[in-house]
Swiss-Prot record:
Monomer. The gene is creN7. This is Chromatin protein Cren7. GO terms for molecular function: double-stranded DNA binding. A chromatin protein, binds double-stranded DNA without sequence specificity. Constrains negative DNA supercoils.
């Protein structure tokens, strides 16, 4: 997870694009479904949004 937090991602919100580093990231994997990595991003205007940044292969 450390490499996910150190990388910048392109986040689109309200028609604008930002290059931001995530504040927090976690894996969401319901039973029997492929998982995803979700990250929280803090926008320059103070809003916090979450976005799927990676899909995990089915296990």
């Amino acid at each position: 997870m450390e490499e996910v937090l150190d990388r910048e991602y392109e986040v689109e919100y309200g028609g604008r694009k930002y290059r931001l580093k995530p504040v927090k990231a976690w894996v969401l994997q319901p039973p029997g479904k492929p998982g995803v990595v979700i990250a929280l991003f803090k926008l320059p205007d103070g809003k916090t949004i979450r976005k799927v940044i990676m899909k995990l292969p089915p296990s």
